[in-house]
Amino acid sequence: MKNEMLALILAGGQGTRLGKLTQSIAKPAVQFGGRYRIIDFALSNCANSGIHNVGVVTQYQPLALNNHIGNGSSWGLDGINSGVSILQPYSASEGNRWFEGTSHAIYQNIDYIDSVNPEYVLILSGDHIYKMDYDDMLQSHKDNNASLTVAVLDVPLKEASRFGIMNTDANNRIVEFEEKPAQPKSTKASMGIYIFDWQRLRNMLVAAEKSKVGMSDFGKNVIPNYLESGESVYAYEFSGYWKDVGTIESLWEANMEYISPENALDSRNRQWKIYSRNLISPPNFLGANAHVEDSLVVDGCFVDGTVKHSILSTGAQVREGAEILDSVIMSGAIIGQGAKIKRAIIGEGAIISDGVEIDGTDEVQVVGYNEVVGVATDED
């Protein structure tokens, strides 16, 4: 049976700029907003867009990500005619090969894609925070009779050199692509979201592999090749909230923006929910000394200190006299008595001992997963 569109989420990146937060897990598995992991946004967008077949391409430290996704039931992707498949590097007749880039990861999974038999493939990054209707992008792709459609976002000119930049004509047909140009001619930045006609992309990847032509990356190789070959390549303009959380600072900023009830992500929109795999936790407990304001406190938290403009993830503890300001406390982390945390991200299961002070006024501070800062007590 022919399926109209298959989504492939690229989730194998190490995310080295997130430092301690990605030493033991892949970047898409990093927690966000108290209740979610970063990949939840791409998966939820697929579910809300009516895409029922999703492949998640993993490579670096995939265990936590695999456990989180499971069979896809949290996103309604476990039906008879739908499903989530975890796609990891495997041994083939030519030997073991790690994914060498974004498009090479797709080539290595040609057999899986052929088994789904899609007309179109949607390529997504698993490490961005945003909401997007992919069905609307697909309709634009069809209306333009495009071979490739690239989602673009208008960025400030001073930031444009960080992105792949698209130069378009009056009809939004892409006439030139520059990968991170020093002197950008446009402010239309690639979001790393692509819709391809599958057979055309397949033919190109197979031919490139046979001829040993380097075609491992969409931005560096595939898009320029399409343009040089005269294929119809169009830009799809996106104007909603989108955040690349590839650095500590940007991850912290996105979490702080998310706290607001009227945040740009529109997180309380019941028509476009963000789904996640949520474990059942007991209710929150606020002790006699608890003072919480302008914060998100998720299920299972224990609070007996002061929390201001911060996020407490599932099962976090803030003990008596502790003060939390402008910070993200991930699941199971313990903030000891009298500790003071300001502008920091505290990783899952971390322990901040009694009286410890962490001040990120000049630079956001990070404590890694299960890391102990100070001298832990028997109670911890």
Swiss-Prot record:
* Molecular functions (GO terms): ATP binding; glucose-1-phosphate adenylyltransferase activity
HAMAP family recorded for this chain? GlgC
Superkingdom assignment: Bacteria
What's the name of the protein?
Answer: Glucose-1-phosphate adenylyltransferase
The record, for NCBIfam families, names: glgC (TIGR02091), PRK05293.1 (NF003670)
Ribonucleoprotein is among the record's keywords: no
- Single Gene Ontology BP annotation: glycogen biosynthetic process
Which organism was this protein described from? Streptococcus pneumoniae (strain 70585)
How this chain assembles, per its entry, is: Homotetramer.
Give the family this protein belongs to, as stated in its UniProt record: Belongs to the bacterial/plant glucose-1-phosphate adenylyltransferase family.
Q: PANTHER family in the record, alphabetically?
A: GLUCOSE-1-PHOSPHATE ADENYLYLTRANSFERASE, GLUCOSE-1-PHOSPHATE ADENYLYLTRANSFERASE-RELATED
Q: Which keywords label this protein?
A: ATP-binding, Carbohydrate metabolism, Glycogen biosynthesis, Glycogen metabolism, Nucleotide-binding, Nucleotidyltransferase, Transferase
Would the keyword Cell membrane turn up in this protein's UniProt record?
no
Question: Where does this protein hold alpha-D-glucose 1-phosphate?
Answer: 164, 179-180, 190
User: What's the catalysed reaction?
Assistant: alpha-D-glucose 1-phosphate + ATP + H(+) = ADP-alpha-D-glucose + diphosphate
Which pathway does the protein contribute to? Glycan biosynthesis; glycogen biosynthesis
- EC annotation? 2.7.7.27
- Entry-linked Pfam families: Hexapep_GlmU, NTP_transferase
* Function statement: Involved in the biosynthesis of ADP-glucose, a building block required for the elongation reactions to produce glycogen. Catalyzes the reaction between ATP and alpha-D-glucose 1-phosphate (G1P) to produce pyrophosphate and ADP-Glc.
